[in-house]
């Protein structure tokens, strides 16, 4: 599964979505506290988003990667929104005065957007992987 971009993308986006869901979406929907510590899930999510960006950018314009360019672009967009959202939320988490400000609105919007984009990217990559439309790693 990790020998193709689609396989790696499926796993990375699924992990990114689960982290956002456990520490941001479920607490809002269920009205409870975060199921993971915010600082831990924020730092891990930032690292996963950076891994997604590096993976999406690596050999993105090679001729053999032409079928996956749309997925790579969407992956990069999902990673950028996750980075912006988590940086805003980590700032808000460490600064109580920032709650309710523009940064709160930006962080909430971008984390919600990244959750939707991550689940879409994971689904698209998984369907491409299952259909056999993969771009194998060439050394």
Name the predicted role of every residue range.
Residues 21-27, 81-92:
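Hydrophobic alpha-helical transmembrane segments and adjacent interfacial helices
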Residues 1, 64-74, 93-101, 127-133:
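Juxtamembrane/interfacial segments around transmembrane helices
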Residues 1-22, 26, 132, 136:
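Cytosolic juxtamembrane helix and N-cap/initiation of the first transmembrane helix
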Residues 57-66, 120-139:
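Cytosolic juxtamembrane helix at the C-terminal end of the final transmembrane segment
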Residues 47-52, 113-124:
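Hydrophobic cores of alpha-helical transmembrane segments in multi-pass inner/ER membrane proteins
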